[in-house]
């Protein structure tokens, strides 16, 4: 854990803040095999995202019919590119060595945990292929403020995350619209010559 500086607190850690471990403040698990029901696109049956160790599309692998994780949580890539951290706010299924941390909410929030992990330099073990293991990662230290401060912090950052998620949904809709319209424009099926631009 990198050195902590407490300038706003006269360079001292507040008495009611503690240094704990990820194993103490979260329920940690590693993703397993992909589910039996998998769809490449979201359907009425398969509405829950499946996330893998990949970096593209935040690890989105596909969709399935039953979530494994329902709580707001954090995932960390555990093989290959180690330490890619994502905040997950909708129910999902983690697969293929993706580590999931479900925070114990009496200690910490998922948003605080996510932002704490984002600023860490997370390293794995192994010479041929780097990997992060649950037992090893559970020992990682984390600063835990008082419950009052965690609640206040989470309340302050929640609207920012809501805005990010809303923008992501809007971007996906616009990308889908572009992909539908562009071939029609290029083929001449859709005529825009009369538009006054």
Give residue ranges: language-model regions.
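Non-catalytic DNA-recognition/assembly elements of restriction-modification systems
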Residues: 1-35, 44-56, 143-152, 158-192
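DNA target-recognition domains and sequence-specific DNA-contacting regions of bacterial/archaeal
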Residues: 18-145, 196
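Aromatic-residue hotspot detector
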Residues: 92, 152-153
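Short histidine-centered catalytic/ligand-binding loop motif
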Residues: 98-102, 153, 163
């Amino acid at each position: 854990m990198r050195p902590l500086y407490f300038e706003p607190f006269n360079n001292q850690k507040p008495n009611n803040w503690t240094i704990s471990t990820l194993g103490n403040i979260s329920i940690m698990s590693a993703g397993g095999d992909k589910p039996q029901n998998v769809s490449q696109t979201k359907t009425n049956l398969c509405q829950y995202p499946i996330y893998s160790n990949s970096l593209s599309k935040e690890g989105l692998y596909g969709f399935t019919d039953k979530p494994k994780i329902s709580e707001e949580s954090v995932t960390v890539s555990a093989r290959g590119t180690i330490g890619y951290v994502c905040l997950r706010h909708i129910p999902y299924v983690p697969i293929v060595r993706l580590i999931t941390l479900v925070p114990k909410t009496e200690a910490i929030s998922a948003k605080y945990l996510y932002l704490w992990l984002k600023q860490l330099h997370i390293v794995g073990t192994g010479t041929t292929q780097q990997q992060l293991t649950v037992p090893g990662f559970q020992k990682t230290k984390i600063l835990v403020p008082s419950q009052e401060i965690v609640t206040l912090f989470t309340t302050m950052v929640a609207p920012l995350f809501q805005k990010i998620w809303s923008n992501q949904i809007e971007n996906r809709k616009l990308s889908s619209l572009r992909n539908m319209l562009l071939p029609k424009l290029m083929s001449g099926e859709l005529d825009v010559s009369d538009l006054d631009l």
